Structures are given as structure tokens and as C-alpha cells.
């Protein structure tokens, strides 16, 4: 069916994005577009969409399945992703165009802010402009990135560590499920771990964060013994624990395992493997593998916390009278996860 109906959407922001010094435009597909494309025009403080459709719509913003609605959301995610400042949306105007006449859709007068902010927020992590092409592409990868960034952006504006962690984990979850393409969660996590290690050179800023940890900080800022007891709770899990140990070689990880494995010493000894494990740890006492520390914290440890948190096994993180070591733990993990997701997307290395 021919696209006979013209629409124009104008989104105005309260503040200018200093990184967008001039207008640029893209031709963007939409679902079931059959080769038709919309024009996205990005400017420092605005987005303009020019669209053609095969019917006249009475409602757009209130219909999440409407292709114009999805294009609006797509453009806003792209705009915020390449912004060095998160600004409120000042206005949204949707016009139906017939000849030289513009008829405004009244529903666009009222809308909610996708990012719930009352004042502009400076953002130090902004994606390169070229990534907009990936964000707006109508493909499995494009959809994955948009979903991930919708959560990642929410995490950037919250002061609540636990809300931040939830959003960051959901963003990371979407990326590793897309990459792993398996129904099993652990399989997908194993696949993204291998991918990150194989592409270590793409994660310099994430590695910089983990490399800044002093030995005692790494040992005592995280609950390693609780992780070991939780993930390997009985004798029958001992071989899995041994396999876990052998996946790592970095000297810092060897050091913390030497200190924390005592909680499962009897189980390991029952298999006659204690001396072998000690020899393995000692043989790697001078080995460096920076990316392993990233995967240990962002995948193994964060997944342990995620399960405790999402399954309601621990108190709500904010139900307390003063800040404690668990808050500091989430603070560190949020910083790490945020950077890992940023580098995964910004370097455009996912296939």
C-alpha cells in the first residue's frame, strides 16, 4: 500500500547538546516499512522526524505499537546517547500534513519525560555520533542496543544505587542474551565472558577501573567468601568450584582465592585436589590478565548479587539507617558495569 499520509514530528529540548554543533540527518527504516524510510534530523536542541504512512492516525503517543511512536522513542534514545548533557524535553509537536496545511495532534501536548530529571545533568559518558546509525537500524542488533540503552540511560540519572544496578544489569542482560543467543542464562554468560576476554583491547577504561583497586581493597570490598559458599554450597558442587578456579590466571585473583578458599577446604580435600589447587594458584602468582578481573566482577560477582537482589533474598538496599559496605560494593559494581556496557556499545564490536 502506498504511503500517502505525511507526518512531521518536532521534539524540542530545554538545553542544547554541546556535542551536536550542527544539524545532521539519517534515513531510517521502521518495522514492516517495505523499503520506505523516515528522515531523522538531529540538531543541538531538537529532533525533527519526517514520515510517510499509509493511513491517518488518531493517536500516536498513546499507542506503543504505532510505528511513528517507536520512531520517536528511537530518536530520543539516540539523541540522549550522544549527549554530554541530559536535558528535559520542552515540547513535542506532531503534525499531520496535507498539502500546505498542518494539523496538530492534540495528544502531543501532554507527555511524560523519558528521563525523569528536573534539572540538566552533566554526562561524562557519551557515545560517538557514528553509533546513532546502529541505534536507529531496524535489525535484531539495533533493537538490542536500543533496549540496552533505555536501561543504561536510566541508570545514569538515578541517585539510588540499587535502582542503578537493576537498570545496568538489565542493559547488560539484553546484550549478553543477544550475543549468546541461547535459552540458558549461564551459557549466555559464558559466551559473553569469552567474547570480552578475546576482545580485551576494546575495554581500556573498564580495565583502568579494576586496575586502580589496591590489593586489600579488592580483597575486602567484596564478599568473596559468601559468593563461594552461595555458588558452591555442597560437596557435589566441588568439581564446579575447581573448574571455576581454573578459568582464571591473574595474580590478583589467585591471591584472593588463596585467602578465601578456606571455607571450602574440606570439600576440595575430600576430592584429593587441595594440593593441586594450591600449586595452581602459586604457579600463577606472577601472571597478569587484567581482563579476567573485569569478567570476574562484572559477570561472576555481579550475577551473584543480581540473584540475591532480584529474588528477594536480601532486604531492600535502601531500608537501612546509614550507608554500609554493601552500598560501597554496589557503587563499585555500578561504575564498572556502566563502563563495560558503554565500551561494548561504543566500540560497536558485537556482531
Indicate residue ranges for each PLM-predicted region.
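Amphipathic, oligomerization/interface secondary-structure segments
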Residues: 136-328, 344-351
Amino acid at each position: 500500500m502506498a504511503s500517502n499520509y505525511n507526518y512531521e514530528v518536532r521534539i524540542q529540548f530545554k538545553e542544547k547538546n554541546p556535542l551536536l554543533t550542527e544539524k545532521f540527518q539519517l534515513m531510517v527504516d521502521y518495522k514492516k516499512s517495505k523499503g520506505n524510510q523516515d528522515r531523522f534530523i538531529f540538531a543541538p536542541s531538537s529532533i525533527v522526524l519526517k514520515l510517510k504512512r499509509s493511513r491517518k492516525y488518531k493517536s500516536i503517543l498513546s499507542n506503543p505499537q504505532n510505528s511513528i511512536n517507536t520512531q520517536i522513542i528511537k530518536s530520543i534514545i539516540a539523541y540522549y546517547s550522544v549527549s554530554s548533557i541530559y536535558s528535559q524535553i520542552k515540547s513535542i509537536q506532531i503534525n499531520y500534513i496535507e498539502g500546505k496545511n498542518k494539523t496538530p495532534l492534540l495528544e502531543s501536548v501532554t507527555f511524560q519525560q523519558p528521563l525523569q530529571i528536573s534539572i540538566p545533568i552533566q554526562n561524562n559518558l557519551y557515545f560517538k555520533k557514528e553509533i546513532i546509525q546502529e541505534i536507529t537500524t531496524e535489525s535484531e542488533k539495533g533493537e538490542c542496543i536500543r533496549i540496552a540503552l533505555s536501561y543504561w540511560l536510566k541508570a545514569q540519572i538515578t541517585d539510588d544505587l540499587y535502582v542503578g544496578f537493576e537498570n545496568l544489569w538489565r542493559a547488560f542482560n539484553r546484550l549478553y542474551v543477544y550475543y549468546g543467543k541461547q535459552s540458558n542464562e549461564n551459557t549466555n554468560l559464558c559466551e559473553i565472558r569469552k567474547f570480552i576476554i578475546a576482545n580485551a583491547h576494546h575495554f581500556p577504561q573498564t580495565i583502568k577501573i579494576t586496575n586502580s583497586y589496591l590489593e586489600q581493597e579488592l580483597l575486602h570490598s567484596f564478599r568473596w567468601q559468601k559468593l563461594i559458599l552461595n555458588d558452591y554450597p555442597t560437596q557435589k558442587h566441588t568439581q564446579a568450584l575447581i573448574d571455576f578456579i581454573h578459568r582464571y590466571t591473574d595474580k590478583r585473583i589467585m591471591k584472593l582465592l588463596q585467602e578465601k578458599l578456606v571455607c571450602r577446604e574440606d570439600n576440595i580435600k575430600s576430592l584429593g585436589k587441595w594440593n593441586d589447587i594450591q600449586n595452581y594458584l602459586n604457579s600463577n602468582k606472577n601472571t597478569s590478565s587484567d581482563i579476567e578481573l573485569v569478567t570476574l566482577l562484572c559477570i561472576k560477582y555481579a550475577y551473584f548479587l543480581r540473584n540475591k537482589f532480584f529474588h528477594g533474598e536480601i532486604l531492600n538496599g535502601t531500608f537501612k539507617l546509614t550507608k554500609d559496605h554493601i552500598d560501597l560494593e554496589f557503587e563499585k559494581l555500578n561504575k564498572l558495569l556502566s563502563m563495560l556496557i558503554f565500551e561494548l556499545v561504543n566500540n560497536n564490536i558485537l556482531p
